[in-house]
């Protein structure tokens, strides 16, 4: 009942380098979790400063593939959101959706990814990957915001076809039930 309901994002500046040491110094360890549809799982942590919102996405995945992605959906109203998608090579896209339809592709932000394994080699057992992301608040409508709603999602490309996974009981088309991130 209390899992994935809301988390706090402490105010701090994060160096986006793929190392998690900045996050180790933050006493707040609030995270959202996704990981029931396949063996791949992810957590999302958040922080912010005056200019950026930061996300630390940690993915556990035994078989890393190029198609393995993680997406942070940032609500922009009742039926609209910004979708920041990262892969093993960094930011793949930042897109604005309204009523489930892509409206616009945006540029901006930065990501650093640390891969713990061998992408595309299923003969070994990988650990997963970590993505550290900085997105300008102005790019995703968060300038001056005190909180926002978010929906983390992943795609696992193991096996015969990609498997999508997100929070249980939420819709990609309505942000009403998405958990909130409070900007401390």
Briefly describe each language-model feature range.
Residues 1-184:
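Structural preference for beta-rich elements and adjacent junctions enriched in aromatics
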């Amino acid at each position: 009942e209390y899992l994935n309901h809301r988390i706090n994002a402490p105010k701090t500046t994060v160096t986006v380098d793929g190392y998690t040491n900045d996050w180790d110094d933050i006493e707040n360890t609030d995270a959202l979790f996704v990981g029931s549809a396949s063996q791949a799982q992810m957590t999302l942590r958040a922080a912010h400063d005056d200019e950026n919102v930061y996300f630390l996405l940690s993915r556990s995945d035994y078989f890393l593939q190029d198609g393995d992605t993680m997406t942070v959906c940032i609500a922009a109203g009742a039926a609209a959101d910004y979708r920041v998608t990262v892969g093993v090579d960094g930011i793949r896209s930042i897109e604005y959706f309204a009523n489930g339809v892509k409206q616009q592709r945006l540029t901006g932000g930065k990501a650093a990814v640390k891969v713990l394994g061998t992408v595309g080699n299923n003969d070994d057992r990988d650990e997963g990957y970590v993505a550290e992301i900085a997105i300008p608040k102005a790019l995703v409508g968060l300038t001056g915001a005190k909180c926002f709603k978010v929906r983390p999602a992943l795609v696992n490309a193991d096996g015969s076809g990609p498997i999508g996974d997100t929070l249980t009981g939420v819709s990609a088309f309505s942000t009403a039930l998405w958990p909130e991130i409070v900007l401390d």
